[in-house]
């Protein structure tokens, strides 16, 4: 069947979006705990609404952290510092409801089923079983230098730039909440050729005109981020298309941890297993295995074994080894997918403890991932973005 030209759209949000506030609070608490207790078990959920933050979850740790203080510092860092924004770091109420991790779950995670049944020794690897059942996907493609799909890459860069011009006061009338969306046109060969549509909605001071916002965002945000050669006279721009965005943040919408899982990953370009990341320590395979799957997929593409690769991992609670590993190259593979799966098994330890060791995940590195995407980041050093396995994969594949 002949491929046709088509459009694909992805979105991102700024750090001041209500759901992203929650992700950042949850990961700030996680980082604070991990900085003192690397073996802590953390599952921390946050919700925000007008004047209120609720932090709930299960945390098992030997240390103490001041959760309300962390919450307020995080909100302040985002920029909600005045009551007229509808949400203020100093005056909002902070409620906490924290329990310990279930003993039933801990029993499966502390020593994996294989260790309990004598199939492997604790000395072989710290015998950590998966903290839950589930399926996770990782993806990479050669559309950008960071091996990410172009639509989500541009959407994240626009969202980050929107925050930069607010914080450095280039556009001092902007407020923290905002969203971006980019539609890319692909040719008959599936290659991105142009940007078709850009949508930006940003919270702003009530007295600023739409005309000024439109002019300023095109000049200081879009032109600064989107390569000129990707835009043409047919590219459409929708800047604050409702005409006004004054009420925003938690005053405009309640927020929850884990409600921006497509923004966090590949913008809908690849499949998603459904599990969120923020607030979870690395024994939760929702997070660690999704990072490992990205690491695997990125190294496959970096090795030139495929132009795009999607890796699926699946786990059973309390069992260390993945119950399945699959690779889909969408017809772009230089070797068969069976060969790729075998290469993955031989080069990556995808048991939870193996992932933690391979990617050094017991560190406070998570808050920086909680806005602007967990993958394809060039502004921070994330271990799952390394391509240090690519040369070995290429050699073993005989290419």
From Swiss-Prot:
InterPro entries: ADOMET_SYNTHASE_CS, S-AdoMet_synt_C, S-AdoMet_synt_central, S-AdoMet_synt_N, S-AdoMet_synthetase, S-AdoMet_synthetase_sfam. It is an enzyme of class 2 (transferase). It holds the Pfam family S-AdoMet_synt_C. GO terms for molecular function: ATP binding; magnesium ion binding; methionine adenosyltransferase activity. It is found in: Cytoplasm. ATP binds at residues 17, 177-179, 244-245, 253, 259-260, 276, 280. Its cofactor is Mg(2+); K(+). Its EC number is 2.5.1.6. Pathway: Amino-acid biosynthesis; S-adenosyl-L-methionine biosynthesis; S-adenosyl-L-methionine from L-methionine: step 1/1. GO terms for cellular component: cytoplasm. K(+) binds at residue 45. Residues 101-111 are annotated as: Flexible loop. The keyword Metal-binding applies. Disulfide bonds: none annotated. It catalyses: L-methionine + ATP + H2O = S-adenosyl-L-methionine + phosphate + diphosphate. GO terms for biological process: one-carbon metabolic process; S-adenosylmethionine biosynthetic process. HAMAP family: S_AdoMet_synth1. Catalyzes the formation of S-adenosylmethionine (AdoMet) from methionine and ATP. The overall synthetic reaction is composed of two sequential steps, AdoMet formation and the subsequent tripolyphosphate hydrolysis which occurs prior to release of AdoMet from the enzyme. Homotetramer; dimer of dimers. This is S-adenosylmethionine synthase. It comes from Bacillus cytotoxicus (strain DSM 22905 / CIP 110041 / 391-98 / NVH 391-98).
């Amino acid at each position: 069947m002949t491929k046709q030209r088509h459009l694909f759209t992805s979105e991102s949000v700024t750090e001041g979006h209500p759901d992203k506030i929650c992700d950042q609070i949850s990961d700030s608490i996680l980082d604070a705990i991990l900085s003192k207790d690397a073996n802590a078990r953390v599952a921390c959920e946050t919700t925000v609404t007008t004047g209120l933050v609720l932090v709930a979850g299960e945390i098992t740790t030997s240390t103490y952290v001041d959760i309300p203080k962390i919450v307020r510092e995080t909100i302040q860092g985002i920029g909600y510092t005045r009551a007229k924004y509808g949400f203020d770091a100093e005056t909002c109420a902070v409620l906490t409801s924290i329990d310990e991790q279930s003993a039933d779950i801990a029993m499966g995670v502390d020593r994996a089923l294989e260790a309990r049944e004598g199939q492997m020794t604790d000395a072989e690897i710290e015998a950590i079983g998966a903290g839950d059942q589930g399926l996770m996907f990782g993806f990479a493609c050669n559309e950008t230098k960071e091996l990410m799909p172009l639509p989500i890459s541009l959407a994240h860069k626009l969202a980050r730039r929107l925050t930069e011009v607010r914080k450095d006061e280039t556009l001092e009338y902007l407020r923290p909440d905002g969203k971006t969306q980019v539609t890319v046109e692909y040719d008959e060969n599936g290659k991105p050729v142009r940007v078709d549509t850009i949508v930006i909605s940003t919270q702003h001071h009530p007295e600023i005109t739409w005309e000024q916002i439109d002019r300023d965002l095109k000049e200081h945000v879009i032109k600064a981020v989107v390569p000129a050669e990707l835009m043409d006279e047919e590219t459409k721009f929708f800047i604050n298309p409702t005409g006004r965005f004054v009420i925003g943040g938690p005053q405009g919408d309640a927020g929850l941890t884990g409600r921006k899982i497509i923004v966090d990953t590949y913008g809908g370009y690849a499949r998603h297993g459904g599990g969120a990341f923020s607030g979870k320590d690395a024994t939760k395979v929702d997070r660690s295995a999704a990072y490992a799957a990205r690491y695997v997929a990125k190294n496959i593409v970096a090795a030139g074994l495929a132009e795009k690769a999607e890796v699926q991992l699946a786990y059973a609670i309390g069992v260390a080894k993945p119950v399945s590993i699959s690779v889909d190259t969408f017809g772009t593979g230089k070797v068969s997918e069976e060969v790729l799966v075998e290469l993955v098994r031989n080069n990556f330890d995808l048991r939870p403890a193996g992932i933690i060791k391979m990617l050094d995940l017991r560190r406070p590195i998570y808050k920086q991932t909680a806005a602007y995407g967990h993958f394809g980041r060039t502004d921070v050093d994330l271990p799952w973005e390394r391509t240090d396995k690519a040369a070995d994969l290429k050699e073993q594949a005989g290419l």
